[in-house]
């Protein structure tokens, strides 16, 4: 039964070939988000391992991590912390740079977003190289958070991001995998 649910969820993700460039297959979760049953199943599946646990905050990576993270935080009755691109937060922040295919980018968080020792669940829609997620983990740890796990709807295992997080000692949970880039 559980395997069938994940197949149905996987079918709710639109695949767009050659976007944003030739050879890439873009995995678009907006179709999953717009389907109330699929969205509910995805959120429930991500929440289930942590229900009744001691999660203090859910941290979501901009932008689709906000959608998923907000829903997960609501179900877990805990707070939500946005991790944003640099320059988007109004209060005092701490930032972390990370490598892109060509160049670097930077994410930030409010310095007081979590209290030291808070147990945090990191959420985003997809993990590929893991660069953004690793930067988010480092950023959260820098302000005192304890990372309980990192959760993603989609894993692209050939690219290796989930394994990179595991190699850092972070528990990783994903709902589905797609081959390719």
Curated annotation (Swiss-Prot):
GO terms for biological process: adenine salvage; AMP salvage; purine ribonucleoside salvage. Gene3D superfamilies: 3.40.50.2020. Pfam families: Pribosyltran. It catalyses: AMP + diphosphate = 5-phospho-alpha-D-ribose 1-diphosphate + adenine. GO terms for cellular component: cytoplasm. It is found in: Cytoplasm. Pathway: Purine metabolism; AMP biosynthesis via salvage pathway; AMP from adenine: step 1/1. Its EC number is 2.4.2.7. Belongs to the purine/pyrimidine phosphoribosyltransferase family. Homodimer. This is Adenine phosphoribosyltransferase. It comes from Methylobacterium radiotolerans (strain ATCC 27329 / DSM 1819 / JCM 2831 / NBRC 15690 / NCIMB 10815 / 0-1).
């Amino acid at each position: 039964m559980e395997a069938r649910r994940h197949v149905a969820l996987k079918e709710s993700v639109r695949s767009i070939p050659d976007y944003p460039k030739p050879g890439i297959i873009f995995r678009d979760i907006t179709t999953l988000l717009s389907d109330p049953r699929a969205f509910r199943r995805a959120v429930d599946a991500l929440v289930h391992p942590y229900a009744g646990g001691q999660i203090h905050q859910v941290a979501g990576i901009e932008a689709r991590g906000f959608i998923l993270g907000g829903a997960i935080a609501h179900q877990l009755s805990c707070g939500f912390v946005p991790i944003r691109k640099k320059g988007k937060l109004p209060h005092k922040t701490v930032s972390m740079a990370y490598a892109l295919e060509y160049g670097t980018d930077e994410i930030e968080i409010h310095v007081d977003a979590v209290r030291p020792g808070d147990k945090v669940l990191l959420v985003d829609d997809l993990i590929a190289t893991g660069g953004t997620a690793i930067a988010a983990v480092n950023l959260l740890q820098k302000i005192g958070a304890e990372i309980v796990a990192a959760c993603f709807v989609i894993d692209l295992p050939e690219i290796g991001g989930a394994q990179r997080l595991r190699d850092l000692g972070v528990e990783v949970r994903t709902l589905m995998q797609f081959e390719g880039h």
